[in-house]
From Swiss-Prot:
Keywords (A to Z) from UniProt: Disulfide bond, Protease inhibitor, Secreted, Serine protease inhibitor, Signal
Database matches in InterPro entries: Kunitz_BPTI, Kunitz_BPTI_sf, Prtase_inh_Kunz-CS, TFPI/VKTCI-like
UniProt signal peptide: 1-24
Domain BPTI/Kunitz inhibitor, chain residue ranges per copy: 31-81
Tissues in which the UniProt entry reports expression: Expressed by the venom gland.
Family: Belongs to the venom Kunitz-type family.
Protein name as catalogued: Kunitz-type serine protease inhibitor 161
Length: 83
């Protein structure tokens, strides 16, 4: 296969991987944890996956502790947990 064909194949595979939604069986277990602001008193915008609504929602993170269902951006949350 030519290098152009390989490059096209790589591009198509990358596009497929980006557009394929995360299935519930592939979703990490921590995506089902509740939002946890932690014990610190900070005021940081964060996002968590809400399994009942099957979407990512905003919450206020205190800055320490909490759990792994805590993302800095909506996009990161959606890529990791949302179907």
């Amino acid at each position: 296969m030519s290098s152009g064909g390989l490059l096209l194949l790589l591009g198509l595979l990358t596009l497929w991987a980006e557009l394929t939604p995360v299935s519930s069986k592939d979703r990490p277990d921590f995506c089902h944890l509740p939002a946890d602001s932690g014990s610190c008193k900070g005021n940081f915008q964060a996002f968590y996956y809400h399994p009942v609504h099957r979407t990512c929602l905003e919450f206020i993170y205190g800055g320490c502790e909490g759990n792994a269902n805590n993302f800095k951006t909506m996009d990161e949350c959606k890529r990791t947990c949302a179907a």
